Regions:
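Conserved catalytic/acceptor-binding region of the Class I
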Residues: 112-113, 121-182, 198
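Class I SAM-dependent methyltransferase SAM/SAH-binding core
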Residues: 40-42, 47-91
Length: 241
C-alpha cells in the first residue's frame, strides 16, 4: 500500500472533513441542555466553528475561542456577523453554557477563571472519547503514540476535571459518533487534521505517518472504498455553584 501523497491544509481539512464527525455529540448536548433563544454560550476549543454555528441556528448567542489561528480565521468566515471568535476566551459575557467538546487537562486553569465570571448554575460541558473498546479509531490513534515513541496517553478524566474546576456534577451521557469518510485519502487527511499525529510527524516524517495510518485503517475500509469507524464519545455536565 502506498502512502497518500496529497497536500495537507490541517485547518481546512478539519473544517471540511473531520469537524462534522462530532455533530451527534453537539446535538445531544444541546438537546440535553435545551440550548436555544436566550442561551449565552461560549465554545472553548471551538475549531472552525461548526458547533457554534449549530448553537446559533437554535437562537443562542455564541462566542468561541481556539488557539489555532487558522481555525479561528475559518470560524470567523463561516459564523454570522457579530459572533466573536478569538484565540483566548472573552470573559465579557455572563455565559450560562460553556462547552469544551475536546477537553484536555490543559484547560483547567482557564476553566477555573471562566467559571468565576459565569452565572451561578451555568452549565459547563466537558467531552472526550468514550471507552477504548467502543472506539474503532483507538487503534489508529495508537499509531501516533508508537511513532512518537511514548506510551498512549489516557484521555482526561472528565469528572476529575470538573471537580478540579470547582464545579458540581449535574449529569453525563454517551453518544455514538461514527467516523465516516468518502475514501482512505480523506480519512488520512481528516485524522491528521486533529493534531493527534503532529508529534509523530515531527519524530518521523509525514509520508511514514500517512503509510502507517493507512495500514491501521485497513480493517475499516469497505468494499466501495469508503471508511467507517464506529466510536462512542462521553460528555459530562457540571454546574457553577
Amino acid at each position: 500500500m502506498t502512502p497518500t501523497l496529497v497536500p495537507h491544509h490541517p485547518a481546512r481539512d478539519w473544517a471540511e472533513i473531520q469537524e462534522r464527525m462530532l455533530v451527534p455529540l453537539y446535538e445531544a448536548v444541546y438537546d440535553h441542555l435545551g440550548v436555544g433563544a436566550g442561551t449565552r454560550l461560549l465554545g472553548l476549543g471551538c475549531g472552525s466553528g461548526l458547533a457554534l454555528l449549530m448553537a446559533a441556528a437554535r437562537g443562542a448567542r455564541v462566542a468561541g475561542a481556539d488557539r489555532d489561528h487558522a481555525r479561528v480565521a475559518l470560524a470567523r468566515e463561516r459564523l454570522p456577523e457579530g459572533v466573536t471568535v478569538t484565540e483566548e476566551p472573552s470573559e465579557d459575557l455572563p455565559y450560562d453554557v460553556i462547552t469544551a467538546f475536546h477537553a484536555t487537562d490543559g484547560i483547567l486553569p482557564g476553566l477555573r477563571s471562566l467559571t468565576r465570571s459565569a452565572q451561578p448554575g451555568a452549565a459547563v460541558v466537558l467531552a472526550g472519547w468514550g471507552p477504548p473498546e467502543r472506539c474503532a479509531t483507538e487503534p489508529v490513534l495508537r499509531v501516533a503514540a508508537r511513532l512518537a515513541d511514548h506510551a498512549p496517553a489516557p484521555g482526561p478524566d472528565l469528572d476529575a476535571l470538573a471537580a478540579g474546576a470547582g464545579l458540581r456534577p449535574s449529569g453525563s451521557g454517551r453518544v455514538a459518533c461514527p467516523f465516516g469518510y468518502a475514501s482512505e485519502a480523506s480519512a488520512v487527511r481528516g485524522l491528521l487534521s486533529t493534531g493527534a499525529f503532529d508529534e509523530a510527524v515531527r519524530a518521523t516524517d509525514l509520508s511514514q505517518v500517512e503509510k502507517e495510518i493507512e495500514e491501521a485503517l485497513a480493517p475499516y475500509v469497505r468494499p466501495d472504498g469508503t471508511v467507517w469507524m464506529p466510536n462512542v464519545f462521553r460528555y459530562v455536565v457540571a454546574r457553577v455553584p
